Amino acid sequence: MARLFGTDGVRGIANYDLTPQLAFELGRAGAYVLTHGTHRPKVVVGKDSRISGDMLECALTAGLTSVGAEVISVGIIPTPAVAYLTRLYQADAGVMISASHNPVEYNGIKFFDKDGYKLPDEVEDRIENIIKEKIELPSPIGTGIGTRKEYTNSHRDYIEFLKSTIDGDLKGMKIVIDCAYGASSTIAPILFKELGAEVILHGAEPIGEKINVNCGSTHPEKLQQLVIENGADIGLAFDGDADRLIAVDEKGNVVDGDHIMAICAIDLKKKGRLKNNTVVATVMSNIGFEIALKEQGINLIRTKVGDRYVLEEMTKGGYSIGGEQSGHIIFLDDNTTGDGEITALKLCSISKESGKKLSELAACMITYPQVLINAKVKNELKNAYLEDEEIKREIENLEREMRGEGRVLIRPSGTEPLVRVMVEGKDYDKISQMAKELAELIERKLN
């Protein structure tokens, strides 16, 4: 049996990979592990808008209550809201039912601990072990069985928290918001209108059949069109569970996570709030991002791909901002996970405070051309490039040739017999040739 937990909880095609039975078992095992079986657990449960959410919530809740848990149901709400509300309601755990940016047929179950952090691998392993080994758990009867309560004020609690993360309001700004027919539909329209912005909406109903379909952070084309048509100051695109944000400037250009992090980090530094003068990002962030930070005297720490690794580094080093090119951005002084709504508020607030258009702010960073070529290598030899002296020497030579204005990244595929060769630099033709020759060298040496 393959590992249940991936890099972001348990995920798969709903009712096929992620069945009601599995959701039930995850509820039982999760509640038991997160309270060490010592007391009646209190668990916050939220979901995005996808149509399998009701089915999985019912099954998950049955599992939770079968071990005596008190379930707080907060309905359709962003993933970061569950992290925040778990802390606010002093719960033992939070659970989000969502597959984030994935298509409608997918769903997922993701746990948060009592402090609103995603679970470390070892805790997920304990939950998984109970399920796989079919370990018997207590089954209370009578008044020992748990109950479910709907908290109707949860959305208001989260909106008021979001407002507290910026100073002032957004009066005078015209903003187009794409909610991807997902969880932000229940929050963003109210939030931005209450802050005084003129708001134009797209995909702002929680319609499960339409979630992420040609909309949201992975498909910003309609948002770009609406920003230009309406003469808006900024466009904001969330994904299905609103833990990530991609923006569009007033000219209709996409502003990705790298640009947003650069804008926010520079602003934090100006205000003396950039902790340890450092930003955390993954190996996939563009070399242009690194250069932009360096020009401002800001340090960059890179991690493996995945916001969980960014968060681990942030908590370890006490840093205030980190994230991914995809728009997962963590403001650790405000929330314990990537929060698209907070990111959107920070970006709009910086634009209003500075009096600068988003295109002017985004000019702090130039995205360097990037070339990606797959080298075909047998699975058992994918990591051998680390030991090959000729390959290592060639990588060093290429980076020396680019003189700090480019980089080489080698990443073995996790699922295919491939090694991905990525080269970034100023001259597209030059880096294309570099990537091609390096990929050929890797194939020749490792096959």
From Swiss-Prot:
Molecular functions (GO terms): magnesium ion binding; phosphoglucosamine mutase activity; phosphomannomutase activity
Catalytic activity as recorded in UniProt: alpha-D-glucosamine 1-phosphate = D-glucosamine 6-phosphate
EC number in record: 5.4.2.10
Active-site positions on this chain: 100 (phosphoserine intermediate)
Keywords: Isomerase, Magnesium, Metal-binding, Phosphoprotein
Residue sites binding Mg(2+) per the record: 100, 239, 241, 243
Cross-referenced Pfam families: PGM_PMM_I, PGM_PMM_II, PGM_PMM_III, PGM_PMM_IV
Record PTM Phosphoserine, positions in chain: 100
GO CC, one annotated term: cytosol
Highest taxon above the source species: Bacteria
Cofactor needs: Mg(2+)
Enzyme class: isomerase
InterPro entries, alphabetized: A-D-PHexomutase_a/b/a-I (IPR005844), A-D-PHexomutase_a/b/a-I/II/III (IPR016055), A-D-PHexomutase_a/b/a-II (IPR005845), A-D-PHexomutase_a/b/a-III (IPR005846), A-D-PHexomutase_C (IPR005843), A-D-PHexomutase_C_sf (IPR036900), A-D-PHexomutase_CS (IPR016066), Alpha-D-phosphohexomutase_SF (IPR005841)
UniProt PTM comment: Activated by phosphorylation.
GO-annotated biological processes: carbohydrate metabolic process; peptidoglycan biosynthetic process; UDP-N-acetylglucosamine biosynthetic process
Cofactor binding annotation: Binds 1 Mg(2+) ion per subunit.
Role of this protein: Catalyzes the conversion of glucosamine-6-phosphate to glucosamine-1-phosphate.
Name under which the protein is recorded: Phosphoglucosamine mutase
Organism: Thermoanaerobacter sp. (strain X514)
